[in-house]
Amino acid sequence: MSDTAESVDVVLVGGGIMSATLGTLIKQLEPDWTIQIFERLGEVAMESSNPWNNAGTGHAALCELNYTPEKDGKIEIGSATRINEQFQLSRQFWAHLVTAGAVPEPKEFINPTPHMTFVRGKENAEYLRRRFDALRAHPLFDAMEYTEDPAVIHSWAPLLVLQRDKDEVIAATRFEGGTDVDFGALTNKLVDYLMEHGAALHLNHEVRGLSKNADGTWHLRVRNDVGRSTVEVDAKFVFIGAGGGALPLLQKSGIPEIKGFGGFPISGEWFRTDDPEIVAKHRAKVYGKAAIGSPPMSVPHLDTRVVGGETSLLFGPYAGFSPRFLKKGSLLDLFASIRPHNIIPMLAVAKDNMSLIKYLVSQLLASKETKFDALREFMPTADPKDWYQVTAGQRVQVMKKDAEKGGVLQFGTEVVAAADGSIAGLLGASPGASTAVPIMLDVLERCFPDCIAGWKKPLTRMIPNYGTLVASDPKKTPKIIRETAEVLELQH
């Protein structure tokens, strides 16, 4: 421990939705704990939490087909129900914060937006019908609708059917109670709350090194990128919620739990329109079906996004490759993350995921016209003059060692925590932000086992279904969802 270092209870590395959520949970549970946040950029929520960088918002598995795979003729809904349950916990915590006055004006970060799935062709329509039948029997999905009638689809999302071939077989599902979430706005609100209650935010501060002190605390060396000065801090607990930057920092920590992990960075692009005439004809998040053999991140979707009170449409994502782990990261990020302990898992992933590599190459080589044709498959009336391309954020998929294959590519998030609970970090991507609350609850349970029993009562007050399933009593499920919808000013 350094004599010159400031001592704090908690350091949060990264100013995104994960750090903001964990900090808010801790501040609600332990108001007297000291918290410092270090963000390398000049504002919070500028990387994956930024709404224009976030590939999917309001994830609740209502419309994403990759969460309901079909095996041996049976639709598996386990992933979908689990993710929806997790999203309900996030909603409950946000509703608590709104009720408590900690997060004002819910419409500034969450808005009612129907979630739809749209498919073309007889075979895909039959699959969608089977998926609908499987999900509708579950209490969290029983309000879902299905149709193959173009007139009904037109009433739900006109742009999907205008000027479409009348002989084409199409089908869609809709869940009217879906949402669009601006995680950038929510992050800012949570950070404001933390600062109002004593937390310190340090912008333009990059954590360059961390090491464990003899007393079990962590010593962090932080560079102020404005004055090029160095700040030293000792913390009892460190959370690394730095998006793609989490892997290198966890590696620097030297904890054995990070061994065998690597990161596979994937960039993305969108077509975006702000034209009010076009935007007015589409109020939904509409997900399609990925081409056979394509990875989950290739699922096309036409999204309504509400940012700063203004509504736009996004279509994509079109994947690409960049070795950066952050949108404003270094071209050396991927190569600098290679270690003797993760080189074999990384090579195994490359060998077993040639279809992903082929897909990324095809996306990189695709012309703007070819990419726009994919939008026209969704929206036949799309005109290039109304749309412009934007670059999305970086997604760093988890690569981890595997006893059988040597290494596997994991689509999802993973908490990596030291055995003593003194440090933890979050790796991975989707469903990400939408499940921030249950992910951070997992961090609390793993890192503060001696405190969790005493926290259970306040956690249950904030999140009524903490430790239980919203769908465990189907008769109560609608009431639970209705209560959060009313507080968050959502339709239900």
From Swiss-Prot:
Pathway: Carbohydrate metabolism; tricarboxylic acid cycle; oxaloacetate from (S)-malate (quinone route): step 1/1. One of its GO terms (biological process) is tricarboxylic acid cycle. Its EC number is 1.1.5.4. Its cofactor is FAD. It catalyses: (S)-malate + a quinone = a quinol + oxaloacetate. HAMAP family: MQO. This is Probable malate:quinone oxidoreductase. It comes from Clavibacter sepedonicus.
